[in-house]
Amino acid sequence: MLGLAGRCSAAAASAARPALRRAAGPSHGFLPLLLSRGAGPAAAVGARRDHAAQAAPAAKAGSATGRIVAVIGAVVDVQFDEGLPPILNALEVQGRETRLVLEVAQHLGENTVRTIAMDGTEGLVRGQKVLDSGAPIRIPVGPETLGRIMNVIGEPIDERGPITTKQFAAIHAEAPEFVEMSVEQKILVTGIKVVDLLAPYAKGGKIGLFGGAGVGKTVLIMELINNVAKAHGGYSVFAGVGERTREGNDLYHEMIESGVINLKDATSKVALVYGQMNEPPGARARVALTGLTVAEYFRDQEGQDVLLFIDNIFRFTQAGSEVSALLGRIPSAVGYQPTLATDMGTMQERITTTRKGSITSVQAIYVPADDLTDPAPATTFAHLDATTVLSRAIAELGIYPAVDPLDSTSRIMDPNIVGPEHYDVARGVQKILQDYKSLQDIIAILGMDELSEEDKLTVARARKIQRFLSQPFQVAEVFTGHMGKLVPLKETIKGFKQILAGEYDHLPEQAFYMVGPIEEAVAKAEKLAEEHA
């Protein structure tokens, strides 16, 4: 027993420093920094963030040389004779054809550090030389990163040559000070009816897309990139964290087709950072930080309003759990890392609006077994300004986007922000849907005939509203067969207000399915009437 206790306390002690490491930088690792194309080298924002973007330094390469003493999967122990590298420093393995970066996670004593590899450790041998870079992982940033795909350490992976920038930034940075933050509240119009009406997104806010496997998180993110990034006209950063490589490839080619990425000149609007499912846990645990670092450059150096898309933030937590286990930390609830809240908080606090610019973040959040009380999604909830919950029950009805209108919430659903008309229509829609939900048990047992006339009218309008909340997406045209629609907020409010007022009680409910504005539903009803005539 004493031996076990001793080992546990030793493990806890060795975990203390890495925990501090995580607190120091929300995203750890080498993530390619994707930057905006506007200005030349900009002045640093302040002494606190001076290290974040500077002209490429001749890093203190060779400040210390160590040798590998152990390799356990993605964990590599390195011993130094002198000049022990601090926590979070990047080390580089010598004598390899491909670059392998290690990030210092723990100091073990006897001049040995335990590191996490950012790539596969195949072929490593004991005694191999390792060089301390003298700094955390640094990635290229600046206009040259737009239209390019990078990995976690900033290497281009799109086979289009090197990224020729003089700007580099460390992926670990502090969150902005309170005095730098802005409290302005504005709606970010997405053109998606159910989102804009019932759970509007705040400009400069954090939005979570919750859903189980296969209910449409990635498609919704792609539609948001399509709608918001184009209309918004600024720069976007997409961080692919632990998701399917095929989807990342599809997204890249769709962006080229839609003109968001231009291969011929420097007019691309988006930078891509990928650390997909096949990457080691170290890369997946840091790639979100790489993407965030790119977005921070746009915000702090160029004063841009940046859109940051992360697909999937759960994989960031999952990779952190794998790394934690490899480092020998005692797991917490449901097997997650004991530093779960710290890891999440240090990253999320960097995503904010300052007086110079904003980062509006849309994060897809996989919900294991559709259980919203799982520690990973539950920890994320606390940081969000709006939640869009995707429901399997709604997807089974064939209604897409499968957004749950009663579970989805927004901090800015306030009459003082969205206006009284929008607020009243949204609450009216939610009330009639809730009434319909409470009547469904009666309908299932007794049938529609047993309802009062008032309840029958409620059910009819609710079913029309439910179908009108569906919408054809531009990015899904290929497999839905419906032309995608982007609906302005005024049109959305007008349409639902008229349905609530009973102006379309005479139209069949199927006329409201997969249409854009209300005029299309009326036209579809006329077409249906002609077909049945």
UniProtKB/Swiss-Prot annotation:
Cellular component GO terms, alphabetical: mitochondrial inner membrane; mitochondrion; proton-transporting ATP synthase complex
Transit peptide: 1-53
UniProt GO molecular function: ATP binding; ATP hydrolysis activity; proton-transporting ATP synthase activity, rotational mechanism
Family that this chain belongs to: Belongs to the ATPase alpha/beta chains family.
Residue intervals passing through the bilayer: none
Residues at which ADP binds: 214-219
Protein name: ATP synthase F(1) complex catalytic subunit beta, mitochondrial
Cited PANTHER family: ATP SYNTHASE, ATP SYNTHASE SUBUNIT BETA, MITOCHONDRIAL
Organism from which the protein derives: Gallus gallus
Residues annotated as binding ATP: 214, 216-219, 244
Highest taxon listed in the record's lineage: Eukaryota
Reactions that this protein is recorded to catalyse: ATP + H2O + 4 H(+)(in) = ADP + phosphate + 5 H(+)(out)
Keyword Nucleotide-binding: yes
Disulfide bond as UniProt keyword: no
Protein task: Catalytic subunit beta, of the mitochondrial membrane ATP synthase complex (F(1)F(0) ATP synthase or Complex V) that produces ATP from ADP in the presence of a proton gradient across the membrane which is generated by electron transport complexes of the respiratory chain. ATP synthase complex consist of a soluble F(1) head domain - the catalytic core - and a membrane F(1) domain - the membrane proton channel. These two domains are linked by a central stalk rotating inside the F(1) region and a stationary peripheral stalk.
